[in-house]
Regions:
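Conserved SDR Rossmann-fold cofactor-binding beta-strand/turn motif
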Residues: 33-39, 43, 89, 102-104
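Active-site "substrate specificity/gating" loop of NAD(P)-dependent dehydrogenases
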Residues: 1-6, 11, 28-29
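A short C-terminal helix-loop "cap" of Rossmann-like NAD(P)-dependent dehydrogenase/epimerase domains
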Residues: 52-70
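A conserved structural motif in NAD(P)-dependent oxidoreductases
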Residues: 58, 70-81, 92
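Short, flexible catalytic-loop segment of classical short-chain dehydrogenase/reductase
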Residues: 17, 39-53
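Alpha-helical segment proximal to the catalytic Tyr-Lys
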Residues: 25-29, 94
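Active-site helix of classical SDR
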Residues: 12, 20
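Short C-terminal tail/terminal secondary-structure segment
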Residues: 1, 86, 97-110
């Protein structure tokens, strides 16, 4: 999903998805699954830093208007991203490869 002023960041996220799919094919037969996780707006120091940079150094976390664009109506938590990563690292995900997991409260689906 694109946003103003972050074209390079957005392009790099899409590049990771393409790399994931290619690497999954290249690792065929090795037993090494390749997947990626694509987090959305996560309550984190990174998000706080971005918000401050966009708003002159004194901005709080995302405002209500930003959160309204997320169907879950809240920011994600790092633990929610970690849960997907833990699943992908487990034996239960042994048949999963070449996939991109979006953890964004439905933002890119809306």
């Amino acid at each position: 999903m694109g946003s103003p002023h972050i074209a390079v960041y957005s392009a790099s996220k899409h590049a990771v998805i393409g790399l994931t799919k290619s690497a999954a094919w290249e690792c065929t037969g090795t037993g090494v699954p390749v997947n990626c996780v694509c987090p959305g707006l996560i309550d984190s120091r990174m998000l706080s830093t971005i918000m401050q940079a966009r708003n002159g150094g004194n901005a709080p976390m995302p405002n209500e208007k930003m959160v309204e664009r997320i169907p879950a109506r809240r920011l994600g938590q790092a633990s929610e991203v970690a849960s997907i990563v833990a699943f992908l690292a487990s034996d239960e995900a042994s048949y999963v490869s070449g996939s991109a997991y979006t953890v964004d409260g439905g933002r890119t689906a809306a």
